[in-house]
Amino acid sequence: MAKKITGYIKLQVPAGKANPSPPIGPALGQRGVNIMDFCKAFNAQTGDFEVGTPLPTIITVYADRSFSFVTKTPPATYLIKKAINLKSGSKEPGKASAGKIKRSQLAQIAEVKMKDLNANDIESATRIIEGSARAMGLEVVEG
């Protein structure tokens, strides 16, 4: 028989940097989950990511206070900023440009994000990422 689920916790945790301090500790403590067990398991599972990369994580808490978790791919905005070494997007998207990004770079980001996107092929995934880049005030150029 399957375990009874008591709830889900959605957090954005930096890869390899899970520790019991807020926001992780209080969120897990309210559900009665062993915080150190989660931190050790999360840090072990995210060892292949660059340390500090924000990873959306969904933690499933069961009635016996055990847990399982799934990590998603890093947010598109993080990957876009990392691809062109940008600190932040434009304060006025559509008016002021924060920089330029090549369509080939967007395609690479789309390949990474493909499993988390609601897209059937790489072209539509690239268009989704392109929309995120434009919303950040970036100019998309061919290349």
From Swiss-Prot:
User: Assembly state and interactors?
Assistant: Part of the ribosomal stalk of the 50S ribosomal subunit. Interacts with L10 and the large rRNA to form the base of the stalk. L10 forms an elongated spine to which L12 dimers bind in a sequential fashion forming a multimeric L10(L12)X complex.
Q: Which UniProt keywords apply?
A: Methylation, Ribonucleoprotein, Ribosomal protein, RNA-binding, rRNA-binding
User: Which NCBIfam families does the protein's record reference?
Assistant: L11_bact (TIGR01632)
What cellular component GO annotations does this protein have?
cytosolic large ribosomal subunit
Q: Which family does it belong to?
A: Belongs to the universal ribosomal protein uL11 family.
Modifications the protein undergoes after translation, according to the UniProt entry: One or more lysine residues are methylated.
What is an annotated GO biological process for this record, any one?
translation
**Under what name is this protein listed?**
Large ribosomal subunit protein uL11
Signal sequence, start to end:
none
Task: Recall the GO molecular function terms of this protein's record.
Answer: large ribosomal subunit rRNA binding; structural constituent of ribosome
Query: What residue intervals traverse the membrane?
Result: none
Species whose genome carries this gene: Rhizorhabdus wittichii (strain DSM 6014 / CCUG 31198 / JCM 15750 / NBRC 105917 / EY 4224 / RW1)
Task performed by this protein: Forms part of the ribosomal stalk which helps the ribosome interact with GTP-bound translation factors.
